[in-house]
Swiss-Prot record:
E.C. number(s) listed in UniProt: 3.2.1.18
Native organism: Influenza A virus (strain A/Turkey/Minnesota/833/1980 H4N2)
Anything else known: The influenza A genome consist of 8 RNA segments. Genetic variation of hemagglutinin and/or neuraminidase genes results in the emergence of new influenza strains. The mechanism of variation can be the result of point mutations or the result of genetic reassortment between segments of two different strains.
One of the protein's GO biological processes: viral budding from plasma membrane
Annotated catalytic residues: 151 (proton donor/acceptor), 406 (nucleophile)
Task performed by this protein: Catalyzes the removal of terminal sialic acid residues from viral and cellular glycoconjugates. Cleaves off the terminal sialic acids on the glycosylated HA during virus budding to facilitate virus release. Additionally helps virus spread through the circulation by further removing sialic acids from the cell surface. These cleavages prevent self-aggregation and ensure the efficient spread of the progeny virus from cell to cell. Otherwise, infection would be limited to one round of replication.
Family: Belongs to the glycosyl hydrolase 34 family.
Protein name per the record: Neuraminidase
Amino acid sequence: MNPNQKIITIGSVSLTIATACFLMQIAILATTVTLHFKQNECSIPANNQVVPCEPIVIERNITEIVYLNNTTIEKEICPEVVEYRNWSKPQCQITGFAPFSKDNSIRLSAGGDIWVTREPYVSCDPSKCYQFALGQGTTLDNKHSNGTIHDRIPHRTLLMNELGVPFHLGTKQVCIAWSSSSCHDGKAWLHVCVTGDDRNATASFIYDGMLVDSIGSWSQNILRTQESECVCINGTCTVVMTDGSASGRADTRILFIREGKIVHISPLSGSAQHIEECSCYPRYPNVRCVCRDNWKGSNRPVIDINMADYSIDSSYVCSGLVGDTPRNDDSSSSSNCRDPNNERGNPGVKGWAFDNGNDVWMGRTISKDSRSGYETFRVIGGWATANSKSQTNRQVIVDNNNWSGYSGIFSVESKSCINRCFYVELIRGRPQETRVWWTSNSIVVFCGTSGTYGTGSWPDGANINFMPI
């Protein structure tokens, strides 16, 4: 082979190799582009349909990295669809309540910077529970804590922490409020925050961290709300608000809110005479509330809220073992399901109850005269039969030698049912303990259980003599 032929042969082989490399690069590029655009589709194995990801709201991006012949391909995995809560599962069948959480805020205040609070409550998003309370704009070991027995000052704010985390100095102040309610619709938190002058207060509606709507006082007499969670079904949340006398006729209205915007307001109707501080729970497709009659009755009023047509009905818990404080002795207390019992109706305390078929589960102070001790039990026929008094499944939560306070309900959705939980406010300081100048609280939380359980007492536990004055 002469030199020219060698040159031609080498050139041909080189050209062939170059062409092959070029074609391989094109194939790799085509594969990369195909896999890159494939991330915009989610295949559903059940019926082999392909659903675009574009309309799905993505809360967070999850990146999966796959290595193919030194080529890095980033593939975005389609997240789950974020949906409104509808609470359509049945209510869990329970045998009683088991301990869940306790924050020990007062004991910790003896040696740490913990907020002065009252009116606590608990509410949960779809994955986690949070505790709320109305702060007094001060920590306990602070001269500003003097006089915090007062309910309404412009420095009060709504505090929010993960359940079990005391309200330390790093706690988020959600809004300005001396009365509040909060709930999660499945997508974001709604906070109802009341503040301002007694005769001209404002309720702000904060959704997903933004102020969306507001409403002013309609009776010019301390606009106020639940001091526990509101309830959202299919994106519409409902909250009960009252404006008017605390010991006489008042104007109660039920507000319906969608993504922070008031969409409807219904007046109270039915036989309830006075409504304060409702404890509400989902009863799909509607909402039910058990409240405080601060005027005529020690039996608790009930509000049934129709979420479809905004209609309202009200009555009273049928149980003759009544839930408010003060109240008559159990042997002489009564309820006819429809009217206030006119037995020591004033002043009262926030509380809760919920229906279980014809029965009722309820909690109340052990003392019939003061906010001390706390017990729960089920009353057979207590939701359907007037003056029923057959009690079962009684539990002591706080013994009668220790102070309690407000209590309220919150609901938690499990895989198969809706569980009911409750919290108890454990008030310390004034007016009962005059050695100190402050008033504050801790909380204890229990949830329904279908299992067995023991006994105990879970008071606040702080030695008042160890506390800052």
